[in-house]
Structures are given as C-alpha cells and as structure tokens.
C-alpha cells in the first residue's frame, strides 16, 4: 500500500482551473503538466513527469515542492501527503480525483483570490476571466476512470455553478 513517503502520485490527480495537473495542489506549478484536448488524462498519468515523481518518492526523495511536506514531517506537523495515506489499495489507475475545473463563483470571500473566485478576479483584481480548458472530451476521459475511482473531490469557485461539473456527475 505504501510505495513511498507519499501516495498522491500513485493514486490521485488534481486538476486546476488553469488546466494544470498534478498529484496534489502543492505539485501543480512545478511539474508543468497541463491537460488539453491534445494531451489526455492517460498521457499525463503514464507520462515521464508522473513516472519520475513516483520513482523519487518511492526512494524517499522529495523533489521540488514536495519539500514542503518534508519540512512538515521534520517539524512534527501532519503533511499534506498524509491525506493520501487513506487512499485504497494502489492500482495502475487513479483512485481519486480532485477537480477544480473553474473559478466560477458567486461569492467574494475575504480570504479568497481570483484564482478561485470569478467575482474577485473581476471586481478586486480587475483581471479578465480565466480561460478554462476543460471540454466534453475531458468529461469523456473522466468517465473512463469511473470504474477505478473511490472518490472525487470538487473545489474551485462554487463547484455546483460549473456547467461541466453537471456533465461529469
């Protein structure tokens, strides 16, 4: 069950509103993986970036942003990696998805940013809307994963406002 210090790249895919993909939100920026209609979920999951990350973590190395979890462990604080310890048995496909597919939101919570709230992006940050890459081909690819999924977590803006979430559900 525990191939390394963190199960996230063995069990989870996190999709951000920007199209970035990683095993968790900490690894989104550094990995450089991005979903597009030309780059499938399967391509990302089986590709060299995830493969190298799995190898490093299996050898107890913390590449790039994974150092944040190492710091937490060394400080005696529960790291983000600990939430992926609860994942079911590791198989060859993801058992968990975290979907932050849009920043569409009808709130402007004081603690939030425009990355997760379209209203904040427009009214406080005065930025144009995010260009969200997810389409019907993404929905079809997620549907192919349903047999292996134990859980799907929805976040980003107000998830129930996202039209694509209704297609996925």
Please name every model-derived segment.
Residues 31, 73-169:
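Conserved alpha-helical substructure of the radical SAM core
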Residues 1-84:
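Accessory C-terminal segments flanking Radical SAM cores
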